[in-house]
C-alpha cells in the first residue's frame, strides 16, 4: 500500500473489470447500476483488479413528508446492509488470495447525468468512512453506445469535503472558502490494462489478408457484412462511422435546456430570499429606531428603558437556502455542454468525409 502522503495521480483498471462493469450496467440500463471495486494503491496509482455488483436494498424514507421517488440502486453503496455485504465479499476474496482492498465503487450513467446528490453522498461516505483514497468509476452507457468507451474516475476535492462535512453552503461561506462548482470533483485519468498473456495472445491471432484489391463498399451495411469482417475477430469497430447524429445530440440538448431551466428556478428562489430578507431587515431597523427614540423620551421622563432586543421575538428573518443544489446543477450544465461540444467536434469530421456523396456535383478530394 502506498503512503498516505503520495497523492493519487491515475487509475489503472484491468480489462476484465471493465468488461464486468459494462455487462452489469448494460443489463440494468436505464436503471442505475452500482457495485464495489477492489484493488491496491501502488505509489499514487490506484490499480483496480476486481469488482462485484451491489444487491438492491430498499432505503427508508428520511421523513414522513418525503414524497420523492426512492432510487434504491443509486443509494446502495452507502446502505448499511450493503456495507456488511461488501465486507463479507472482501473477506472471501482475501481467502482466495485476491487483491481485497476497498478502493471505491462504480455506477452507471445515462447521457452524463451523474452529478447528483446520490453520487455526492456515496463518494463522501467512501472517502470519510471507508478509505480516503477511494474513487468513483462512472460508466456512461449511452455514450459508450456511440462507439467509444466512456469510463471516468472521480474523487471529491478536499475543499468540497470540508464544506460538505460542515454543511455550510451559504453565499457568505462560499465566498470565504472560494468554493466553486468546478471544485466539486477531481477527475483522474483512467488507463485500461491487459495482462501480458492476453496481449501476447492478441498478437498471435491470425488476421486473413485480402488476396486482391476490392471495390469500395457502397454503404456501411455492406462494409459490415463483408467477408473480411466475418472471417476475423480482429475486425475494426465500425460504430465510429455511424452518422446517427440526431438522437444523441437532441437528447443532450434537451437535458441541457432542462438543467438551464432548473438553474434559473434556483436563481429565482435565491433572489426571492434576498428580497424577503431585505424587507424583514428594513422592518427590524425601523422598529429598533422607533424603540431607541421611545427610550430617549422615557429617559427624559426618568422612566426605565424598554428592551431593545425584543425584535427577535416579534420578527423572524427568513433562512437562507442551501446553494449546494445550485452548484450541482451548474456542474451538470457544464457536463452536458462538454458532451455536446465533444460530440459535435467528432461528428464534423465525419460530415466532411461524406461531403462528396451528400452534395451533387462535388467529389471527395
Swiss-Prot record:
InterPro entries hit by this protein: eIF3h (IPR027524), eIF3h_C (IPR045810), JAMM/MPN+_dom (IPR000555), JAMM_MPN+_peptidase_M67A (IPR050242), MPN (IPR037518)
Stored Gene3D superfamilies: Cytidine Deaminase, domain 2
GO cellular component, one term: eukaryotic 48S preinitiation complex
Keywords: Cytoplasm, Initiation factor, Protein biosynthesis
Family, per entry: Belongs to the eIF-3 subunit H family.
Task of the protein: Component of the eukaryotic translation initiation factor 3 (eIF-3) complex, which is involved in protein synthesis of a specialized repertoire of mRNAs and, together with other initiation factors, stimulates binding of mRNA and methionyl-tRNAi to the 40S ribosome. The eIF-3 complex specifically targets and initiates translation of a subset of mRNAs involved in cell proliferation.
Name under which the protein is recorded: Eukaryotic translation initiation factor 3 subunit H
Species name: Aspergillus terreus (strain NIH 2624 / FGSC A1156)
Amino acid at each position: 500500500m502506498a503512503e498516505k502522503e503520495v497523492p493519487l495521480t491515475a487509475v489503472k483498471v484491468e480489462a476484465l473489470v471493465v468488461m464486468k462493469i459494462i455487462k452489469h450496467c448494460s443489463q440494468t440500463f436505464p436503471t442505475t447500476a452500482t457495485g464495489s471495486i477492489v484493488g491496491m494503491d501502488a505509489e499514487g496509482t490506484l490499480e483496480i483488479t476486481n469488482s462485484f455488483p451491489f444487491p438492491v436494498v430498499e432505503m427508508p424514507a428520511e421523513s414522513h413528508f418525503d414524497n420523492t421517488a426512492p432510487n434504491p440502486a443509486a443509494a446502495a453503496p452507502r446502505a448499511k446492509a450493503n456495507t456488511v455485504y461488501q465486507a463479507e465479499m472482501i473477506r472471501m476474496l482475501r481467502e482466495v488470495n485476491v487483491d481485497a482492498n476497498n478502493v471505491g465503487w462504480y455506477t452507471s450513467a445515462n447521457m452524463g447525468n451523474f452529478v447528483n446528490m446520490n453520487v455526492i453522498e456515496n463518494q463522501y461516505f467512501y472517502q470519510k468512512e471507508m478509505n480516503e483514497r477511494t474513487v468513483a468509476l462512472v460508466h456512461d452507457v449511452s455514450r459508450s453506445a456511440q462507439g467509444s468507451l466512456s469510463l471516468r474516475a472521480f474523487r471529491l476535492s478536499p475543499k468540497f469535503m470540508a464544506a460538505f462535512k460542515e454543511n455550510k453552503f451559504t453565499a457568505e461561506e462560499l465566498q470565504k472558502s472560494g468554493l466553486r462548482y468546478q471544485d466539486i470533483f477531481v477527475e483522474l485519468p483512467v488507463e485500461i490494462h491487459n495482462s501480458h498473456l492476453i496481449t501476447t495472445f492478441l498478437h498471435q491471432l491470425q488476421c486473413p489478408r485480402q488476396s486482391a484489391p476490392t471495390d469500395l463498399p457502397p454503404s456501411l451495411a455492406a462494409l459490415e457484412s463483408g467477408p473480411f469482417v466475418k472471417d476475423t475477430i480482429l475486425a475494426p469497430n465500425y460504430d465510429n462511422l455511424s452518422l446517427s447524429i440526431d438522437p444523441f445530440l437532441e437528447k443532450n440538448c434537451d437535458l441541457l435546456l432542462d438543467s438551464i431551466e432548473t438553474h434559473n428556478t434556483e436563481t429565482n428562489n435565491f433572489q426571492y430570499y434576498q428580497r424577503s430578507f431585505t424587507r424583514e431587515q428594513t422592518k427590524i431597523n425601523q422598529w429598533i429606531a422607533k424603540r431607541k427614540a421611545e427610550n430617549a423620551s422615557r429617559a427624559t421622563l426618568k422612566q426605565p428603558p424598554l428592551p431593545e432586543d425584543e425584535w427577535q421575538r416579534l420578527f423572524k428573518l427568513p433562512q437562507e437556502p442551501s446553494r449546494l443544489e445550485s452548484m450541482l446543477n451548474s456542474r451538470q450544465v457544464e457536463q452536458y455542454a462538454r458532451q455536446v461540444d465533444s460530440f459535435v467536434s467528432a461528428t464534423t469530421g465525419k460530415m466532411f468525409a461524406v461531403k462528396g456523396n451528400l452534395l451533387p456535383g462535388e467529389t471527395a478530394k
